[in-house]
Regions:
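Hydrophobic faces of well-ordered beta-strands that scaffold small-molecule active sites
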Residues: 59, 75-79, 105-107, 131-133, ...
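The catalytic core of metal-dependent phosphodiesterases that act on cyclic dinucleotides
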Residues: 152-217
Length: 217
């Protein structure tokens, strides 16, 4: 306790059966309280709008490591949301609401812009890590998606060959033609395309062959 460590019991060596039984006799079974509803942690539409205006988006980056060399070769940008009191919330508090209220594309634009600025800074420091950003099907069916991404790339100076657009496989069957058009246009500009959660959806191999993906996850 003096070290800030809490334990349910301890056994000194040598260990014998009587010591183990004595320790188990002290065990008290507890029932975990019911998990709070996930929706209790969701922000409101008004909070998201206010946060977007106040630049509440914070990104953390999950590293991707080469299995052979063990070198870090890239990162995936993950959303965190800073509340007015300084707390950081995960994407589950933001994304479902954004999808329901038509704010998803605005949110995605802000995330992509921030990620590209970070990528540009890393490149200037000599680190050429590929950066993956997640996109929803609703993002990829927006008529202005390619122009928006091009603008963010131009403004940041981030190299397109280090950018990976990531989309979940199970969503690829939604509005296939428009999604494929957006992905193909960005692939032609040099961006990589990643299919996330591969094998968990219902996409046929024939359909997957139509998409210009460069990696499967």
């Amino acid at each position: 306790r003096d070290l800030g460590i809490r334990v349910i019991g301890s056994i000194s060596k040598p260990i014998n059966r009587s010591k183990i039984e004595a320790l188990l006799d002290r065990v008290e079974l507890k029932t975990a309280p019911p998990a709070k509803s996930f929706t209790q942690f969701e922000l409101s539409e008004a909070e998201i709008r206010a946060g977007l205006a106040a630049d509440a988006i914070r990104l953390v980056y999950q590293p991707k490591v080469d299995a052979v060399s063990l070198d870090m070769v890239g990162v995936e940008a993950l959303l965190r949301w800073e509340t007015p009191d300084g707390a950081l919330l995960g994407p589950g508090a933001v994304v479902p609401v954004a999808e329901r209220t038509g704010l998803m594309f605005t949110l995605t634009q802000a995330i992509f812009k921030a990620a590209m600025l970070q990528l540009s800074q890393w490149c200037q420091a000599g680190y050429r890590w590929k950066v993956s950003c997640n996109f929803s099907v609703s993002d990829l069916t927006e008529s202005s998606i390619v122009r928006v991404l091009e603008d963010a790339l131009t403004a940041s100076g981030a190299p397109t060959d280090l950018v990976i657009l990531e989309v979940t496989e199970s969503k690829l069957s939604e509005d296939v033609s428009r999604v494929m058009s957006s992905l193909t246009r960005m692939r032609l500009k040099g961006c990589g395309i990643s299919i996330d959660d591969f094998g968990t959806g219902f996409s046929s191999m024939e359909q997957l062959r139509r998409f210009p993906f460069t990696e499967l996850k």
